[in-house]
Amino acid sequence: MVTAMNVSHEVNQLFQPYNFELSKDMRPFFEEYWATSFPIALIYLVLIAVGQNYMKERKGFNLQGPLILWSFCLAIFSILGAVRMWGIMGTVLLTGGLKQTVCFINFIDNSTVKFWSWVFLLSKVIELGDTAFIILRKRPLIFIHWYHHSTVLVYTSFGYKNKVPAGGWFVTMNFGVHAIMYTYYTLKAANVKPPKMLPMLITSLQILQMFVGAIVSILTYIWRQDQGCHTTMEHLFWSFILYMTYFILFAHFFCQTYIRPKVKAKTKSQ
């Protein structure tokens, strides 16, 4: 019989942590101060307004070197996180099934999972710096960018506080998408031409991530009715709301960026 303990043991056997993954467990700190994400998000939004006002009458900075380094570091970080977390989530999925990955908390006490969970949360604060490059280089700042950055920080902190197992999928999928996305940003900043389909692929993966996340939320709600799923109705509500808004916004961005221009070009040619 497959149990949460058996699955946890299997994960611990297959995934021995590296030395750096055995660093001090920062979870108690982030769990206690999770609400700090609200003032951080608010300061972020205020700084956006201040920054845009400051740059209004100024010429945009080049920042090519810093942007390459910034994107490269986040790409490497995301690739490492994706490799480790996809390996663990894949093992739990194949060993115990989907319900084990979204309902039972045993596997999240694995040292590797603990490490990549708290550094993932920390990275959501660091990634707010993406917006600084947009503002200082005087590039268009669209709604989906700052909405996504600010709400993901708060949502991740909230889920972290509640130790929600389903959050493992959010972390894992986000690492995977960001591994590709920041690699693309690195190439673009370095004036290396990536494949033309890569931006469309990244947006497609973001849409898929939100769709899968919404499905996971629905399944978590269903399994919770059997009193067999570690979550709260509050977390379920907000996760579903955010996944759906992200899905709609990314789908709209996809249509505006990749579909409408082709339709207009085709119409003009006729």
From Swiss-Prot:
| Superkingdom of origin | Eukaryota
Q: How is it modified after translation?
A: N-Glycosylated.
Q: Which pathway is it part of?
A: Lipid metabolism; polyunsaturated fatty acid biosynthesis
- Protein keywords: Endoplasmic reticulum, Fatty acid biosynthesis, Fatty acid metabolism, Glycoprotein, Lipid biosynthesis, Lipid metabolism, Membrane, Transferase, Transmembrane, Transmembrane helix
- Leading EC class: transferase
Pfam families noted in UniProt: ELO (PF01151)
Expressed, tissue-wise, as follows:
Testis.
Q: Which residues are glycosylated?
A: N6, N110
Annotated EC: 2.3.1.199
What does UniProt give as GO cellular component?
Answer: endoplasmic reticulum; endoplasmic reticulum membrane
**Catalytic activity line of the entry:** a very-long-chain acyl-CoA + malonyl-CoA + H(+) = a very-long-chain 3-oxoacyl-CoA + CO2 + CoA; eicosanoyl-CoA + malonyl-CoA + H(+) = 3-oxodocosanoyl-CoA + CO2 + CoA; hexadecanoyl-CoA + malonyl-CoA + H(+) = 3-oxooctadecanoyl-CoA + CO2 + CoA; octadecanoyl-CoA + malonyl-CoA + H(+) = 3-oxoeicosanoyl-CoA + CO2 + CoA
Main location per UniProt? endoplasmic reticulum
User: Does this UniProt record's set of keywords contain Transferase?
Assistant: yes
- What membrane topology is given? Multi-pass membrane protein
Its BP terms in the Gene Ontology are: alpha-linolenic acid metabolic process; fatty acid elongation, monounsaturated fatty acid; fatty acid elongation, polyunsaturated fatty acid; fatty acid elongation, saturated fatty acid; linoleic acid metabolic process; long-chain fatty-acyl-CoA biosynthetic process; positive regulation of cold-induced thermogenesis; sphingolipid biosynthetic process
Positions of short motif Di-lysine motif: 266-270
- Transmembrane segment boundaries: 29-49, 63-83, 115-135, 140-160, 164-184, 198-218, 235-255
Query: Which PANTHER family has this protein been placed in?
Result: ELONGATION OF VERY LONG CHAIN FATTY ACIDS PROTEIN 3, FATTY ACID ACYL TRANSFERASE-RELATED
Its subunit composition reads: Interacts with TECR.
Domain commentary: The C-terminal di-lysine motif may confer endoplasmic reticulum localization.
Question: What family is reported?
Answer: Belongs to the ELO family. ELOVL3 subfamily.
Put simply, this protein is called Very long chain fatty acid elongase 3
